[in-house]
Curated annotation (Swiss-Prot):
Keyword Protein biosynthesis: no
Origin superkingdom: Bacteria
Species this protein is from: Escherichia coli (strain K12)
Subunit structure: Homodimer.
Cofactor: [4Fe-4S] cluster
SUPFAM superfamilies: Actin-like ATPase domain
The protein's name in its UniProt record: Uncharacterized protein YjiL
Amino acid sequence: MAYSIGIDSGSTATKGILLADGVITRRFLVPTPFRPATAITEAWETLREGLETTPFLTLTGYGRQLVDFADKQVTEISCHGLGARFLAPATRAVIDIGGQDSKVIQLDDDGNLCDFLMNDKCAAGTGRFLEVISRTLGTSVEQLDSITENVTPHAITSMCTVFAESEAISLRSAGVAPEAILAGVINAMARRSANFIARLSCEAPILFTGGVSHCQKFARMLESHLRMPVNTHPDAQFAGAIGAAVIGQRVRTRR
């Protein structure tokens, strides 16, 4: 059996995938620690434990160059495109929103990379932004869908993390319900993301990946602003790691 491991060392989370003859058989997910290399090592040891042969290891993400035992290192753009096509073969565009960056990837009919945009200069519109506002209002990102269900969003004027946090506090003091503020934040983020995607004139189907893709409220609001379907997948957060594992699988097959 041919084994390939892909590890995506992100700024917020470290994700790992084991492919066995092209099938996902193991997953690994932990928050990225102060020393990302320790999470990469843990992922490698956990995913390969008990295997009869040593897997091919491909690293991607911010921390991909922090260890010296990988067989290959690949940029996250290539990996996210491949991972998206693995999860949803018809995908023509990927919107990935992680902890501290967001990216849009445009693919052709064959799944090849056409173009991409990346925003890693500002926390607005990222998982970190959503996390800060959620914590300010006494909840967590994991609870957003249930809290904001059937809630009318309150207008949010600032998308700067610092100013938006102050605005959320002011609105709460003025008596605005926290769930309405949170729905407003999600709506503002979705609108910003839609404008970002529109810069590439992307075609459907679109796959939404990254940690924020778990928020179905965000996905539905993004659909509304884009006026086209936005798909999600239970393994969407692992797209980068999946793509890395696919690359490793291809390299091993050619040998």
